[in-house]
Every structure is written in C-alpha cells, then in structure tokens.
Amino acid sequence: MARLFGTDGVRGIANTELSCELAFRLGQASAYVLASDVHRPTILVGRDTRLSGEMLESALVAGICSVGARAVLVEVLPTPAIAYLTRFYEADAGAVISASHNTVEYNGIKFFDKNGYKLPDAIEDRIEEIVTGGMPTDFEMPIGERVGRPVRQRNATRRYVDFVKETTNVRLDGLHVVLDCAQGASYEVAPMVFKELGAKVSCYYHEPDGTNINDNCGSTHPRRLCELVRELGADVGFAFDGDADRLMAVDERGQLINGDQVMAMLALHLKEQGRLRQNTVVATVMSNMGLDIAMKKHGIKIEKTRVGDRYVLEKMLADGYVLGGEQSGHVILLDYNTTGDGLITAVQVISAMVQAQRPLSRLAGVMQMMPQSQYDANVDDKKKYDFDKNEKIKQKIAELELKYKDKGRLVVRASGTEPRVRVMIEGPDQREMDRDVYALSKLIEHELRG
C-alpha cells in the first residue's frame, strides 16, 4: 500500500482521493498523536482559497474536536503564517488545508508541530497508522463537556503581517513593486506588507473566487508578471504560489529570478553581514550547477539533499545552517521562520536591494544559470516510484548518463506531490538536451501509464 503522506503532507483530488471522511480521520489522528501528552490540546487550522477548503476544514475540525481537542480557525492565510502563528499562539500543533501550486481540483492537508516545523516521517507514520487502523482501543471518546470546541482567531492576519514587517528595518519608499498573488493565500497579506513598508504596489491575481487559484498565474506561471514589470517600469516583481511558501522574483528588466538565484544573492548578502552560519547554503540535487559555481567562487560551501523542502530543512536543523531552498522557489531563512516563506523571502530580497543600492539584476547576476532542460512525464500515481525497476527505462537512463557524464548530468525522480516523474538534464547544447529529455519522458509515460 502506498504511503498516505507525500513530501508535503496528504494531497489528492478533493472530494474523491482527499475525501471528507479522510479529512475527519486525519483530524482525529493528528490531534491524538501531536498532543497526546496534553489534557486538552489546541490545533491551529488555516487554509488557502480553494473552493474545497471550507468543506475539508469542516471535516478536519470535526475530527479534531471529536477527540476532545480545541480547533482555532484563522481561515485564509499562507502556509508559513500557520507555522509562525502556531508558535505565537502557543498551540500544540498547526494544520494547513492547501495543495500549494497545484490546480484547483487538488487539495491537501499538512501539519506542523508546536514549534512550527513540518513533521518528520516517523510522526507522519504514527498518524497514518491511526488513520488506516482506527483510534487505539483503549482510547475513550469524549462526551459532554469533554468534546472539543472550534473558535475563530480574528487578529491572526494582522499578527502575521506585523511579523513579516519585523524581519526588516528597511523602508521601501520610492520603490515600485508588482505582486502576483496567484489568486491564493497571499492575496490580502502581501499587498498589506509592501504598502505598509512604503512601497508603491501594483497587485494582480488577487481576487480569488475559489476556482481560479494558480490559474495561469503565480510562481509556476510568471510570464505575465515579467511583462507587467517591464510595462509598468517597476523596480521588482514577486510571484507567490497558492499557499505562498514559494517565491519567484522578476528583476527591473522583466527577467525571471528563480529560487537558486535568490539563494545565491541572499547567501552573499548574509555573508557580507556575517550572518551566513558556517558559510554554507543547503540546496537539492535538482539545483542548477550555476549555483555550485557561484558559491565556490565566493568561498561559500554548498550541501545537497534529495528533492523536497522538508529534506532541506532537516539538513539545516541537523547541521545548524540558516539558508537553504529549491530552484522552485522554496527558500528557508531559519533566522525568521521554520519553513519556506515566500513573503519573508520577498522582503529580504528587496531589503538587500535597498541596502546594497543596486537593482535586482545586479544582485542576481552573481549566478549564471547553466543550460537546463526539464520535462514531466505524466504517469499512474501508483507506478511513479517504479521507473528505476523498468528495464527499458533503466537502459535509456544508463545511455543518457554515459552521454552526459563528462559534460553535464541527468536527474530522474518521482514527484512527491503529483502523478509525475520529473526528468532534468544539464549540459552545453540546449536543443540536444531538449530532445533527450523529451524522448526519455515519453518512454516513461508509455511504460508507467495505467
């Protein structure tokens, strides 16, 4: 049986794969496991703007309250806001209903511990055991006054906005910022932060209707933002994903600045301030080779993990690093928050611009992207981890690994959140890489479709 939890919580198509029944059982199990040593635990619950969010919230909260826990609802806020607010309100755990960058039919449920960190695999496994096997036989379901109660926290948005603003001492007067809020969880807080810091703000994709989240907008579709920054003559643009834990930036020329480039410029900024602990950045095996080259040139070490911001965070916590992330835009700044926070990252990027008195193009220019080609093979979700067991696929991978051995690299991996196998090649010839990536991806699709 496939593991219920992926790299970013439980995710699936809402109302079928992620049903209300499953959400209810996740509520019960998480409240029991995450706060088993507390008499009446408190679980903070937030969500993004998806239509299915309120439905799943009701089911999750019912499960939480059914085991005697208290649910505190903060409604629509970014995922990193829940991590912070769980700590601020001293809750025993936090829960977020969101499918991040995925399209509207998907939703997900992920959890934070009382310190605002994503759960380790072992804790997720304990929750999954209860979801699939039921509550422990010695657990007595509460009745009467022992049943839990949901309450709404009205000032959570204000508290998170103030927290983000407190991460900088820089004013943004005279700067023009363009925001793409992905019709998602940042639609209210992002413009508040930048306006209150003094910037002129042009905000787009900030009118969610429950069905338009990530719809040709946000960090996975930044093309329009690039055009807008050029058309408006703005200083910088920022695109968030549906739950605002990712960020893509756009410089004053309308050029996209991805997560690797953001990490490179922030690494140098932190090093200059004496704040880059152990002079090290944590990235993943999918990071561009240009990041390695740039960091080596400036005397900064780089550690690599498997793909997934949870694994980046684990490495950072284990070895005491403060900066890490992924090319996709998850950037973790442990001096400020316990998870990737797109809004805080954006504030740090623009703060670095102000302090250095340089445009973003100059700061991000510290790293030159190596040519890279990527393609996602759409496969049966139950078969996506079997690509390295299929003889035809293994043979093609071996052939390409040999081809790129001395001039680049090949990475093939199953997505932790979608029914896809991701293929990436780095090398000197873009057209040749595009052909090879496409050929391997189509072979994987043919072999691993249902």
Regions found by a protein language model. Give the residues of each.
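Short glycine-centered, acidic/aromatic-flanked micro-motifs in structured strand/loop junctions
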Residues: 46-47, 179-181, 251, 335, ...
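Buried hydrophobic positions in well-ordered alpha/beta secondary-structure cores of metabolic enzymes
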Residues: 8, 45, 82, 95, ...
